[in-house]
């Protein structure tokens, strides 16, 4: 993986946004609040299950997957939310995947993309997302705050992704309620689950936290379970021979 991954993908996003038209706002899909759900179900490590056909680090993961059936399995097996990759070039996703999945499930859906503009947020909402991703490393704090306020003003929830203490403090400052800790470094693309463990010492009681990336096994989930409300898992589920069994393995009872 090139060490220029993040700048490369952001440059591509700037080109996409420049060519993107403004969409008329459509009604917000009705479902429960992810924040409230995670807050109210602390006895079990919750799962945000991802639909991801490919990634820059692994290449093709599961190109032949029936995305709607995969999402239905996630919901049936107790996922708290479904994350849907919509980036076409780097992850072989599509906005239509978000639209199709959101129309077939009742739980929250996350638009997993590199969002840098309000136009993308409106498109996500119109496609059925109730949660969007904002990545601290991809935005200035001023722009992050603007996009966060814009999204929440439209009734969306926001998963604010961090990777180090400075980014975590930024997420706290802008008022983020749902905060992700990505165990993957978006510059080197290497993963280290210790990132989650180290940052957990700085968590606040009134927020909810999600550990993202590098969660493949029950042992991985057990490591982060004492500190996090949920884990976001993509590759392990997309590669699993038995998705239901893998979900059962990852949903840790926290007593």
From Swiss-Prot:
Q: What's its top-level EC category? A: lyase
Q: Which InterPro entries match?
A: Aldolase_TIM, Indole-3-glycerol_P_synth, Indole-3-glycerol_P_synth_dom, Indole-3-GlycerolPSynthase_CS, RibuloseP-bd_barrel
UniProt pathway annotation:
Amino-acid biosynthesis; L-tryptophan biosynthesis; L-tryptophan from chorismate: step 4/5
The catalysed reaction is: 1-(2-carboxyphenylamino)-1-deoxy-D-ribulose 5-phosphate + H(+) = (1S,2R)-1-C-(indol-3-yl)glycerol 3-phosphate + CO2 + H2O
Query: Which terms are listed as keywords in the entry?
Result: Amino-acid biosynthesis, Aromatic amino acid biosynthesis, Decarboxylase, Lyase, Tryptophan biosynthesis
List, alphabetically, the PROSITE patterns matched: IGPS
Assigned EC number: 4.1.1.48
A single Gene Ontology MF term assigned here is: phosphoribosylanthranilate isomerase activity
Example GO biological process: L-tryptophan biosynthetic process
Which Gene3D superfamilies does the record match to this protein? Aldolase class I
Sequence similarity: Belongs to the TrpC family.
Name of this chain's protein? Indole-3-glycerol phosphate synthase
Query: Lineage of the native species?
Result: Bacteria, Bacillati, Bacillota, Bacilli, Lactobacillales
Q: Which gene encodes it?
A: trpC
């Amino acid at each position: 993986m090139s060490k220029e991954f993040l700048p490369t993908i952001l440059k591509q996003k700037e080109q996409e946004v420049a060519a993107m038209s403004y969409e008329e706002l459509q009604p917000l899909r009705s479902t429960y609040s992810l924040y409230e759900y995670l807050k109210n179900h602390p006895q079990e490590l919750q799962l945000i299950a991802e639909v991801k056909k490919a990634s820059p680090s692994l290449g093709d993961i599961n190109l032949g997957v029936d995305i709607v059936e995969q999402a239905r399995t996630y919901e049936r097996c107790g996922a708290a939310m479904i994350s849907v990759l919509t980036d076409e070039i780097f992850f072989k996703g599509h906005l239509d995947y978000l639209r199709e999945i959101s129309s077939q499930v009742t739980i929250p859906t996350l638009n997993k993309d590199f969002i840098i503009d309000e136009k993308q947020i409106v498109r996500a909402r119109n496609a059925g997302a109730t949660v969007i991703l904002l990545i601290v490393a991809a935005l200035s704090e001023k722009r992050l705050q603007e996009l966060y306020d814009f999204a929440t003003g439209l009734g969306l929830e926001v998963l604010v992704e961090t990777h180090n203490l400075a980014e975590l403090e930024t997420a706290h400052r802008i008022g983020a309620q749902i905060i992700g800790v990505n165990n993957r470094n978006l510059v080197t693309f290497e993963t280290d689950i210790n990132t989650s463990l180290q940052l957990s010492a700085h968590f606040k009681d009134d927020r909810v936290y999600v550990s993202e990336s590098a969660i493949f096994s029950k042992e991985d989930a057990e490591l982060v379970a004492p500190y996090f409300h949920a884990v976001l898992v993509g590759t392990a589920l997309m590669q699993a021979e038995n998705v239901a069994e893998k979900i059962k393995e990852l949903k840790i009872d926290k007593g």
